[in-house]
Amino acid sequence: MPASLRSPLAIILGAIPGALARYYATIFLAGLFGNDLPYATFLINFSGCVGMGLVVTLATQPALMSPDLRLLLAVGFLGSYTTFSTYALEVTSLWRMGQLGQGVLYGLGSLGIGTIGVLLGSLIARRLTI
């Protein structure tokens, strides 16, 4: 297989089961806990963050995980299972590099800008349908 196709293929092979895992986990957890609060999303985000921590830590040792497997799991599976795990990884990476202020700013800024983005998108959609 050409080297240029290895990375995209690894990501694709992880993304499909990641998306399906999120879908079925959401159905299962909503049935278990109800829909009063978004428990399913909360638990999926938490489990995705645990998974990201495991993958990224194991990937630092090439004997334990190949670069292709890291892409399949971290970018493909966990990326489609929950992007929150990537966000949390980026915040903790900034902290580990001694950039506490930037980590806090990025973390809070992402939450704020994400919320504003959803509100803005909703406003635009309402304007388009009027």
Curated annotation (Swiss-Prot):
Binding positions (Na(+)): 79, 82
Compartments where found: Cell inner membrane
GO terms for biological process, alphabetical: cellular detoxification of fluoride; fluoride transmembrane transport
GO molecular-function terms, A-Z: fluoride channel activity; fluoride transmembrane transporter activity; metal ion binding
Swiss-Prot/TrEMBL keywords: Cell inner membrane, Cell membrane, Ion channel, Ion transport, Membrane, Metal-binding, Sodium, Transmembrane, Transmembrane helix, Transport
GO cellular component, one term: plasma membrane
Keyword Transport in record: yes
Membrane topology, record value: Multi-pass membrane protein
Catalytic activity: fluoride(in) = fluoride(out)
Activity regulation (record text): Na(+) is not transported, but it plays an essential structural role and its presence is essential for fluoride channel function.
A Pfam family annotated for this UniProt entry: CRCB
InterPro entries for this protein: FluC
Chief localization: membrane
Transmembrane segment boundaries: 9-29, 39-59, 71-91, 104-124
Domain of life: Bacteria
HAMAP family: FluC
Stated family: Belongs to the fluoride channel Fluc/FEX (TC 1.A.43) family.
NCBIfam families documented for this protein: crcB (TIGR00494)
Function: Fluoride-specific ion channel. Important for reducing fluoride concentration in the cell, thus reducing its toxicity.
Protein name stated in the entry: Fluoride-specific ion channel FluC
Source organism of this protein record: Synechocystis sp. (strain ATCC 27184 / PCC 6803 / Kazusa)
